[in-house]
Amino acid sequence: GDSIANGADDDGSGSVALLAIARAMQHGPVRPRRSMLFVWHVGEEKGLLGSSWFVNHPTVPIDSIVAELNADMIGRNAPDLLYLVGPRVSPNNQSRRLGALVDSVNAAEPMPFRVDRTFDAASHPEHIYERSDHFNYARKGIPIVFFTTGLHAEYHQPGDEASKIDFVKLARVSQLLLDVGRAVGNATARPR
């Protein structure tokens, strides 16, 4: 084998989801009331560089961004398990309402995920909340939810290959993100 970490899950899975969701939003029967931004950030592993740049040089007024949904590593581990990070640990409880919206949308899915909030704690030793791009949005007061299926032995390793992705799970997480995005996009109030 080689020594290249191809990143099928970290973060090919999130990129695939973002493309699929953007396409579904564009070609769906009804577009959301709010505009949507689909943003890929670079330099996450080097210190959240891309998201830091974006929130400090946004392409739209920063106060017009009502929520940030982050999908990173969403294609592995138990088929019914999804970790959500942000609603409990975000500053000033700014993401609690968005977290409640995610919970209600998940409950309405044909096969709801078993949600684990283990990482949604400031005291968690892995500090997951501070390790992905949603963090910079939260620092600007934007409600966030980070969707992940969790860490695995191939994280940042050559074994993070497409053959290990659970594509059914990836599709289900993508559908949930699409449905949450539509709910946020059609809500009359900001998810504060």
Residue locations for each model-derived region?
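C-terminal soluble interaction/assembly domains
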Residues: 7, 21-31, 51, 55, ...
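His/Asp/Glu-rich mid-to-C-terminal helical/loop segments that flank catalytic regions of hydrolases
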Residues: 148-192
